[in-house]
Amino acid sequence: MASNDYIIVAPNRRGLVGFGQEWLEAISKDYGGQCMRDYFSAIDDVAKEPFVDRDRLGCVGASFGGYSVYWMAGHHEGRFKAFIAHDGMFNLEQQYLETEEMFFVNWDLGGPYWDPKTAETYANSPHKFVDKWDTPIMVIHGETDYRILASQGMSAYNAAKLRGIPAELLIFPDENHWVLQPQNSVLWQRRFFNWLDRWLK
């Protein structure tokens, strides 16, 4: 990204391995909590630098980062001018019933959405904040992703279009949670940077 004239902000937020197991597990059952405040504090801090144009900030992420993009789209309060979400969770209730990895959703989300103990977790599902979406978003998803099904991406894209928000959908019929085939990788890169350039340059 730097070679395309973008400054990269990649905070070591809760849920990553940089500060031990407790830090790593801090996002479990707290998806819309402290880890999102980590993101916002990082971007707000970097945006104060004289070499940063705070009027041209974008937000991109994949997997949990894709969930984060969808969530921040409803909470960013004008910070960002464009979003890109790759293979992200949009509707956590839908995710609980669709994924092939039940251990993960039981551990990270705390169990099924019909259990009263999980109410706070599912209250942070991005689809519940679509009424606050107002920023162009690109959605990318692999159709053979069984961890986070492509229906999540399609739902997010449709929500943006129904809200009248500029949106683009890129579906790879032959990719899973990652884009592995060289020709698809080239297409991914081109569309990714075309979207950012369109809204940020």
Model-derived segments and spans:
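Active-site-proximal cap/loop segments of hydrolase catalytic domains
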Residues: 2-4, 10-201
